[in-house]
Curated annotation (Swiss-Prot):
WD repeats lie at residues 167-208, 213-254, 257-297, 305-343, 345-382, 424-462, 529-568, 571-610, 639-678, 683-715. Residues 8-21 have a biased composition (Polar residues). The keyword Repeat applies. PROSITE patterns: WD_REPEATS_2, WD_REPEATS_REGION. Pfam families: Beta-prop_EML, Beta-prop_EML_2, HELP. Residues 23-53 have a biased composition (Basic and acidic residues). Keywords: Repeat, WD repeat. Belongs to the WD repeat EMAP family. Residues 1-53 are annotated as: Disordered. Gene3D superfamilies: YVTN repeat-like/Quinoprotein amine dehydrogenase. This is Ciliary WD repeat-containing protein ctxp80. GO terms for molecular function: microtubule binding.
Length: 716
């Protein structure tokens, strides 16, 4: 395999490519179709899915859309819950001061693999750097501890006005590691995207770089070998390529790359070169920063290989580029000219590629990581990982791989595989329940239920939500997942006071009962009364009953002994978003999508119209209702009832934690009355859908919907 010139024309414009005959694998086409397609967003007032443009310039309200009838001034005028707000007989003295507590981000469970690539690397110390949500993560895989770029205490503001001068405030979408493994670069989405360069060992910020308005997101980013420049590609209509001086923070060059999306980019490793290559949809090109004009030079295929899309690219020390083709082949380039191709993957597409120690290491749709010698195009080592490979890196005989299923895998020189990170990986993740002081359970739209060990910071069990494909009886949860509604779960509950069962609410309306956290894979009962998907569930304090809140507007009550249905609570005019049991198990209060706060007597399953007054002396086993006298001050100024997604009280009753649409976890004094100030914590990039104190309030747990990330906040 030589590196001679292409037999194609020397002028790129003279090569006419018929893209209808290009060799692009069908599954790669499907991925790109999904990336550009309209997505479903959840209207939190109607509870229905609505279509939105997936590449909206600003995603402030992307996945939770407020309906006109229930938001803004109309909401403020109507407030249907207001008549149910009564001051409780016993409460703490109100204070507007922020609570005198500090919660630090200790650990996050997440890795963005759904739509990103080449985003997981070794740093100089051998630790693994990657990203999830709005965080850059440095994982010490031996100690299982993490450091972060971003995250921590922040102002209680919308993302539209949140400060983005110090860290990311929205989804990180692209990453690179410098060739010397000391710097990381990350870029985020938003109407005016920003990117950062930060220390790969400590997470300390080194520089910030702002793109033009309308950039939508950073799709690719790369640090040059000398650590002088960072190249950044936007997802605007022209897919502009920017070059910034890392130390000065100034823009050096900018040019339009064309109409097609750029997936990845890399700088030449050859001494003296200042050349960057871009790989994308129907696109391979090089850009020479040292040339008289900074202009794109399209790849020339000639007769050396079939045109295709390219998902990733790397360079060797001699100045040859290697791109991962959408047809399973690796393309070898000298400058803009294709010199040869070789195929070691055989099928699918090449999803990741890296030049390490004189070899090409690549990963593909075929679920294989392959070390190959580009000189002869032969595979020297093949490792089967059984999943689409999104990212590969190699250092000191070890390989780290990011997989599409949300797993980060480390492989030693003997081929031994170790999962160093597991995460939810498709659609959204909503389900979160605390089982005991060290154990919690999560579920998502990826057909996964996880049991987690908080103290040891790892997953202890994983089970499928369902093994059959079933659609919803009516309606349906909004999601980008490719899994059937039966395989998606938005709600989990643990019977802490009783038999230890775990209930999982599916998006097709069914509820499955699992034996417990140690037998999460064993379904002992299936409940099918609900007509739509399940958003909330709770066991009674003594564990004798299970309440299931459905999007068919009803609450179903079951005996936890045999899960026979005891009754149905019917009074709400919209889907159920939260429910709480009284400590004695005699009352249930619930909130729905129409902002109603209602009370029911469990004995006769009837609504108590005077429930607010009749329960002023009542203590509540849980406090998830976002409307009430004790939580009247939790809504940010100018927002409506849809902006708070979950509420929990600490076991001592002194603190309140809320999850909001701005990606914030907020800690308040109890009560949180008008004018109260929270301690606000940022780390999530999208709407936080659930948050809980652990027993003794030593930790706060939170889960982000679209970012699919679980965060563990430790009290200092």
């Amino acid at each position: 395999m030589g590196c001679g010139g292409s037999s194609g024309a020397s002028d790129p414009s003279s090569e006419k490519i018929n893209w209808n005959n290009a060799e692009i694998h069908d599954e790669f086409k499907q991925e790109q179709k999904k990336a550009g397609a309209k997505r479903k967003a959840f209207d939190k007032t109607t509870g229905k899915a609505v279509e939105k443009e997936r590449t909206a310039a600003d995603r402030e309200f992307d996945f939770f859309e407020g309906a006109d009838a229930g938001s803004g001034e109309q909401f403020m005028a109507v407030r249907p819950y207001e008549g149910a707000i009564v001051e409780p007989a016993q409460h703490n003295e109100p204070s507007k001061d922020a609570p005198d507590v500090t919660y630090d981000l200790e650990y996050v469970y997440g890795y963005r693999a759904e739509d990103s690539r080449m985003n997981c690397f070794y740093n100089k110390n051998g630790n693994v750097c990657y990203f999830t949500a709005a965080l850059g993560v440095v994982l010490d895989q031996d100690k299982n501890t993490q450091k972060f770029f971003g995250g921590g205490q922040t102002d209680n503001t919308s993302k539209m006005v949140a400060r983005d001068d110090m860290y990311h405030t929205n989804d990180i979408t692209a990453m690179d590691m410098s060739n010397c493994r000391t710097l990381c670069a990350t870029g985020q989405n938003g109407s005016v995207p920003v990117a950062f360069v930060w220390d790969a060992a400590t997470g300390a910020k080194k520089g910030r770089y702002k793109l033009d308005k309308g950039g939508r997101e950073v799709t690719a980013i790369a640090i040059d070998p000398k650590k002088k420049y960072v190249a950044i590609c936007a997802n605007d209509n022209d897919h502009q390529l920017y070059i910034f001086d890392i130390d000065k923070g100034t823009q050096v060059k900018k040019d339009k790359s064309g109409p097609d999306r750029i997936f990845h980019m890399a700088w030449s490793l050859k001494d003296g070169d200042s050349v960057v290559a871009t790989a994308g949809e129907k696109h391979f090109a090089i850009w020479n920063l040292g040339a008289d004009s900074f202009k794109k030079k399209k790849g020339i295929y000639g007769d050396k290989g079939k045109p295709t899309s390219h998902s990733c690219v790397c360079w060797d020390d001699a100045g040859n580029a290697y791109s991962g083709g959408a047809n399973s082949s690796i393309y070898v380039w000298s400058g803009q000219n294709l010199t040869s191709t070789y195929d070691v993957h055989g099928k699918g597409f090449v999803g990741a590629i890296r030049w390490c120690d004189g070899k090409i290491i690549s990963g593909g749709k075929d679920g294989q990581i392959i070390i190959s010698n580009p000189a002869d195009g032969k595979a020297e080592k093949t490792i089967d990982v059984g999943e689409l490979v999104r990212s590969v890196d190699m250092k000191g005989g070890k390989i780290v791989a990011g997989l599409r299923n949300g797993t980060i895998l480390e492989i030693d020189s003997k081929g031994t595989k170790k999962e160093i990170m597991k995460s939810h990986s498709d659609g959204e993740a909503w389900g979160l329940a605390v089982a005991d002081k060290d154990t919690f359970v999560t579920s998502g739209d990826d057909n996964k239920i996880y049991v987690w060990d908080l103290k040891n910071r790892k997953s202890t069990a994983l089970a499928e939500i369902c093994n059959e494909d079933k659609n919803s009886k009516a309606g349906g949860a909004s999601s980008l997942t490719e899994y059937a509604p039966s395989k998606c779960g938005r709600s989990v509950a643990v019977n802490v006071g009783g038999n230890g069962n775990v209930a999982v609410g599916h998006n097709d309306g069914r509820v499955t009962i699992r034996g417990g956290v140690k037998s999460i894979d064993k379904v002992t009962k299936t409940l099918t009364d609900s007509g739509e998907w399940i958003e909330c569930m709770a066991y009674s304090p003594d564990g004798s009953m299970l309440a299931v809140g459905s999007h068919d507007n009803n609450i179903y009550i079951y005996s936890s002994a045999d899960y026979s249905k005891l009754g149905t609570l019917k009074a709400h005019n919209s889907f159920i978003v939260s429910l709480d049991w009284s400590s004695d198990g005699t009352y249930i209060r619930s909130v729905c999508g129409a902002h109603e706060l209602l009370f029911f007597t469990v004995e006769d399953f009837k609504q108590d119209p005077s429930g607010a007054t009749n329960t002023v002396e009542t203590t509540w086993h849980t406090n998830s209702a976002k409307y009430g006298w004790l939580v009247s001050g939790i809504f940010p100024a100018g927002t409506d009832g849809t902006h708070i997604n979950h509420v929990d009280f600490s076991s001592s009753g002194s603190l309140i934690v809320t999850a909001d649409d701005y990606g914030l976890v907020n800690v308040w004094r109890n009560p949180a009355r008008a004018g109260a100030t929270p301690v606000s914590l940022r780390g999530h990039s999208e709407h936080v859908v659930r948050t809980y104190f652990t027993q003794g309030e030593s930790y706060i747990l939170s889960i982000g919907g679209y970012d699919k990330t679980i965060m563990q906040w430790k009290k200092k």
